């Protein structure tokens, strides 16, 4: 068929409902704001790993759905999460991205979260323990017990990751993610892990476009090393398995690292209960990824910053018991594939940056195809069909026409 005119370009694709989406799901500000309320304020987010809070009074800060969050480790060794907001005048309490509250700061006492604005102080359980000039200003009208921090649901699970949920009554974390994690649970929980690598990317694209790259592998044609070494029968036989809540599991596969130019086999270093050179990938709705590949575990967490902007945080993890030599080997293996200058990750970022360039607020809507059917194997796009079907349910919008309320697609999302 020749190149199309505008009417043909905008026509409904000759596919079934559920095999394509309207690009407004990536570009519309109203839809984005609704996603924060209906999805990100209801979903469990793997905020950090517990190894990033190794000591009592350590803390980390971030945001979820535009809400500032602080996670602390108390003297009782419990990890807790709170809104990083003073209940007095709405001031941000802790401005640092990480640190320790064990020692005093210029604006606060040791072992306290102190709001520098008016010197209100809170302990590691979120209790208000000090109000400056309390009796003079409030007499007996405002007891400290009534102005504690806003606590959040927080659990440490699935290999020591710290999960936070803004909803007071969410689905349990076990029900949320237990089933897709079953394939790796024994491995991840066999012994303590710790983070050895962190970097982040802020990309002008929609967060869902990034997650798409982890839900399908048809784009491996973009990855040079995958294309020249990995396209074999075992690769194409891998299955994409769908789970409740929009999660995806990409089946195991033995990676032949010794076929990569300049690489050698990585069979000498793995994780407990995992055969050498194995590769598992768990994609969690709405945009988190756990990727265990041979000797290194990678975890991605997205923070949507707008319809056309996302922050992606990348962590590499190994075993806490690693010898210095083993740790350096894991770092080298991780960074050669997934580091900022590795042979894989930057190619994915180039791909979604290009999509973000053509799908921006104000541009006309486009039809984005998810219609490949290959018996749910690695180049089937069933992972994306499943994801957007669940997205439609959460949002009560049809992905193929977000102006319409959701109804089940004619084709199964698998």
From Swiss-Prot:
Record note on cofactor: Binds 1 [2Fe-2S] cluster per subunit.
Gene3D superfamilies xref list: Naphthalene 1,2-dioxygenase Alpha Subunit, Chain A, domain 1, Rieske [2Fe-2S] iron-sulphur domain
Binding-site residues, Fe cation: 225
Alphabetical list of InterPro entries matching this protein: Rieske_2Fe-2S, Rieske_2Fe-2S_sf, Ring_hydroxy_dOase_asu_C_dom, Rng_hydr_dOase-A
EC number: 1.14.13.111
Molecular function GO labels: 2 iron, 2 sulfur cluster binding; iron ion binding; methanesulfonate monooxygenase activity
Cofactor: [2Fe-2S] cluster; Fe cation
Keywords, ordered alphabetically: 2Fe-2S, Cytoplasm, Iron, Iron-sulfur, Metal-binding, Monooxygenase, NAD, Oxidoreductase
Pfam families for this protein: Rieske, Ring_hydroxyl_A
Subcellular compartments: Cytoplasm
Recorded coiled-coil stretches: none
Regulation: MSAMO is inhibited by metal chelators (such as bathophenanthroline, bathocuprione, neocuprione, alpha-alpha-dipyridil and sodium EDTA) and by sodium azide, sodium arsenate and potassium cyanide.
Domain Rieske: 44-163
Family annotation (PROSITE patterns): RIESKE (PS51296)
Record's note on what induces expression: The msmABCD operon is induced by methanesulfonic acid (MSA).
Catalytic activity reported: methanesulfonate + NADH + O2 = sulfite + formaldehyde + NAD(+) + H2O
Gene Ontology terms: cellular component: cytoplasm
Residues bound to [2Fe-2S] cluster: 86, 88, 115, 118
Subunit-structure text: The MSA monooxygenase system consists of 4 proteins: the 2 subunits of the hydroxylase component (MsmA and MsmB), a ferredoxin (MsmC) and a ferredoxin reductase (MsmD). The hydroxylase component consists of a 3 alpha (MsmA) and 3 beta (MsmB) subunits.
Family: Belongs to the bacterial ring-hydroxylating dioxygenase alpha subunit family.
Alphabetical list of PANTHER family matching this protein: 3-PHENYLPROPIONATE_CINNAMIC ACID DIOXYGENASE SUBUNIT ALPHA, CHOLINE MONOOXYGENASE, CHLOROPLASTIC
Function: Methanesulfonate monooxygenase (MSAMO) mediates the primary degradation of methanesulfonic acid (MSA) to produce formaldehyd and inorganic sulfite by initial hydroxylation of the carbon atom prior to spontaneous cleavage of the unstable hydroxymethanesulfonic acid. MSAMO has a restricted substrate range that includes only the short-chain aliphatic sulfonates (methane- to butanesulfonate) and excludes all larger molecules, such as arylsulfonates and aromatic sulfonates. All MSAMO components are required for enzyme activity.
Protein name: Methanesulfonate monooxygenase hydroxylase subunit alpha
Lineage: Bacteria, Pseudomonadati, Pseudomonadota, Alphaproteobacteria, Hyphomicrobiales
Gene: msmA
